[in-house]
Amino acid sequence: MPIDDRRYTHRRLPMKIDEALKVGQFMHRVTRDPSDPQGTWSAALMGIKFRRDLVDDYVRECFGSTVQAGPFRGMRYGFRAAGSMYSPKILGSYEQELHPYLRSLPAYRRFVNVGCGEGYYAVGARLAAPGIEVQAFDIDPEARRLCRDLAAANGVDDGLRIGERCSPRTLEALAEPGTLVMIDIEGAEVELLGGLEAGRVADCDFLVETHNTPELGLTLRAVVGALSGSHAVTVVDQQPRDWSAIPELLPLGHLDRFLAQWEGRGPEPWVFAKSRRRAG
């Protein structure tokens, strides 16, 4: 049997000399006082970030800025992410447990994205369902700017509106039948959902990421409680990633393959809530 071993040939990750020097200097300071737990932890995080940045550069060299797989395949993506990881989005494995729900976007008339970041989902929704109306929100002005830029780069800025803060009353006004609401706001989902009048959002569907916060703990129970009266609720757990499906990752070692698809998540599931009234 002929063997092609070229796909396993190791390619050096792009090296960032200046950043490598910074990491080395920091590590040197830490080793002089290894009893400092905070310093040791900071050094470990810096090392992980440094290696992840190298993997991001490798992924850019392989694929440029085009999303390779998933429901948003073909999307022109920016060269950095806001509040999330870069490489998983380019590879198309980002939050892949949501893909079955995102592939149903053409069935909706409106997509509301609360906590849109740089616009991966807001812009992706317009590409996956060209006729859909998209309303995005983010309290970070830099994220809103990146979202506008990403929409323009993909030619979908005409059907996408971007706002700053989404209050319960704002969301109720948008929650018409045929609307999918996606919420990822780092724990503030409890306040937003808790302020809704259930009858005014009973005709739309929800995708909500839960979070572990120092004040509330895991918000899963609160999210389910807020939606279960009017919606059929499904807890969407994280799924393992399969790097073997991406030939370009084969030359990398296990750690780098892992980092290419690593999203930096804790045990924080999503919740999908399907309108009971619309289903009936």
Where are these predicted regions, by residue range?
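Short, hinge-like loop/turn segments at secondary-structure boundaries
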Residues: 130, 152-155, 178-181, 199, ...
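Conserved Class I S-adenosyl-L-methionine
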Residues: 224-236
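A short alpha/beta connector and helix-capping loop motif
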Residues: 179-180, 191-224
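S-adenosyl-L-methionine
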Residues: 2-135, 137-188, ...
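Residue-level marker for buried hydrophobic side chains located in beta-strands
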Residues: 110, 135, 181-183, 206
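A short acidic, amphipathic alpha-helical/loop segment
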Residues: 101, 124, 128, 170-174, ...
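Generic detector of well-ordered alpha-helical packing
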Residues: 96, 114, 139, 185-187, ...
